[in-house]
C-alpha cells in the first residue's frame, strides 16, 4: 500500500500539527516518551493530536524511518559498533551491561515503587549480537545525565596494521658504559685523593 500523501506532509516541521507543545498532555508524555516503544516521538505526538482513529496511519511509515533510540539502536559509526538506549526510568544501580556468548546484554530492573500514577515495576532485557570484527575486550559503557546508555566497541586491530608503537623508557641506576680500558670503572675524585703521593 503506498504512503498516504498527507501523512508525509504531517511529518514536515512546517506542518500545522507541529507546534511548541508537541505533547500538550503531560501525563501522555510521561507515559510514552520514555518507554521502550517501537514508535518515534513525532509519531506518538501525531497520534495524540489526531485521536485513536488515526492509529492505522502509522502502518504506512517505513520501519527505517522510526527512531531507534527508544528500543536501543545499534549502528556502526566512525568504525565503531555503538548502542544507544533510553533508560531514563532506571537508576544507575538498576542497570547491568554484560557480554554473553558474543552478545552485549543490557538489563534494567527495579522493584515495585510508587510514582505519580500509582505503583509500577519495570524489567527489560536487550541483546545485541557483536560482530566478530569488533574488539570485545575494549567495550566502553557510559550513562548520560539525561538517561541515555551509550555502549561503544572499537574494531579489532590486526598485527599487520601495527606499524608503530611507543617503547617506554625505564629509569635505572648508574651505567656500566663509562669504564677505563682495563674494564674497571674510572676512579672518581675521592679515590684519587686516597692514593699515596709518588716520591
Curated annotation (Swiss-Prot):
Residues 63-170 form the sHSP domain. SUPFAM superfamilies: HSP20-like chaperones (SSF49764). InterPro entries: A-crystallin/Hsp20_dom, Alpha-crystallin/sHSP_animal, HSP20-like_chaperone. GO terms for molecular function: unfolded protein binding. CDD domains: metazoan_ACD (cd06526). Keywords: Stress response. It holds the Pfam family HSP20. Residues 188-199 have a biased composition (Low complexity). Residues 173-199 are annotated as: Disordered. One of its GO terms (biological process) is chaperone-mediated protein folding. One of its GO terms (cellular component) is cytoplasm. Belongs to the small heat shock protein (HSP20) family. This is Heat shock protein 67B3. The gene is Hsp67Bc.
